[in-house]
Regions:
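A structural boundary/capping signal
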Residues: 1-135
Length: 135
């Protein structure tokens, strides 16, 4: 797996708050394995569906947390974190929303709707509207 540092993240998301200096870029297959674990965990906790008290920012934060836990499990890692974060942005419809973001390498970024969880495409306007990012 490739690695990046805070500089790569801040080029894409200048407002990003990074808790680590170095990150491992996961593969799509690895992220999709977390999709399955996340869905199982949310079902067990009875919070898979959207609720006013467990909404998009809670789900995005939970998915980011689970990726960090799974990434750190097997053995000592070469980097401090995994390149999965959460972003808040304004949708094309005008409302705020929180989802996840993953760096697959230093320039390839994909978004995740954690309420699926499923891969998500942001419009150009939505991408530019990101006002918070945390890794």
């Amino acid at each position: 797996m490739k690695t990046i540092d805070q500089t790569h993240i801040c080029r894409q998301f200048p407002m990003a708050k990074c808790s680590d200096n170095t990150y491992t870029c996961p593969t799509e297959a690895w992220v999709e394995s977390v999709f399955r674990a996340y869905k199982t965990l949310m079902k067990w906790l009875k919070v898979l569906s959207w609720r006013k008290h467990h909404d998009c920012d809670d789900k995005a934060g939970g998915f980011r947390w689970l990726c960090g836990v799974k990434w750190g499990q097997p053995k000592a890692q070469k980097t401090q974190g995994v390149a999965v974060g959460e972003v808040w942005y304004t949708t094309d419809q005008g409302g705020g929303h929180a989802i996840n973001v993953v760096f697959l390498d230093s320039t390839t970024v994909r978004f995740i709707e954690p309420q699926g969880p499923v891969w998500k495409t942001l419009s150009s306007g939505e991408r530019k509207s990101v006002y918070f990012a945390r890794f």
